[in-house]
Curated annotation (Swiss-Prot):
Its EC number is 7.3.2.1. PANTHER family: ABC TRANSPORTER I FAMILY MEMBER 17 (PTHR43423:SF1). Part of the ABC transporter complex PstSACB involved in phosphate import. Responsible for energy coupling to the transport system. Residues 1-27 are annotated as: Disordered. This is Phosphate import ATP-binding protein PstB. ATP binds at residues 71-78. Its main location: membrane. The gene is pstB.
Amino acid sequence: MSNTLKKDETFKGLDLNKNQKEEKPAKLPALSKRADVIKVSDFNFFYKGKKQALFNINMEIKENSITTFIGPSGCGKSTLLRSINRMNDLISGSSVEGSIEVFNEEIYKQGTDVSKLRTEVGMVFQKANPFPLSIYENVVYGPKTQGVKSKKILDQICEDSLRKAALWEEVKDKLETPALGLSGGQQQRLCIARAIAMHPKILLMDEPTSALDPIATLKVEELVLELKKEYTIVMVTHSLQQATRISDMTAYFLKGELIEYNTTKKIFINPKDSRTEDYISGRYGD
């Protein structure tokens, strides 16, 4: 399979005549009735020299849900997050055991199209990282690399993505200005728009608000709650308050192990493991 997606595969079905004020998706079914879109089975991750970072991780993540990974620094939560779209492949000497399935496809099997995987599973990093290009070129950069040349289609992708990232109204009159001139919160929402522009099905977010002020953090959280209607979201956060505000499910990690995974309400109100209780009550810090 080619590592370059044809534009008809990723961007097919675009309606260039549609009203940009799209109807909101129907109300989501109960969490228990949603399909599993990510399944992690007996997953182990090793850095160079066989230094083990994750130990026998098992979990399933539902579609159109927000799952937060919490735990002290170095507990493995970001390592697992980056394993879901194989970003850790970029770490020299790393290796894995076990499996991760995304939409019932084992992503670590030989012959996996990693480029296609990373299109379907987008990534938003801790620090906003807009390219030193215009706002417009930041958003359409990915589609262009996948072969989209039509200005009309690129314009639509740009507007749709910025609208979904709750940024369109703030930047629609300055799309050709440098993205680096935006505020920190706007830059992070631009990076979310850039990820959305690739038409992913899953969004991975690695502490996306850690560098933002409280107002910008609130805007991103409101955006994430809205995006859940269309995407499955997995987020690493150091903020327990953030986890309680936005997530459906929470996973607590400690020293590379998944200690407890349950609905966010149960994790924070009635944890089953004393180590989880120690962490959320502040008796075990970072």
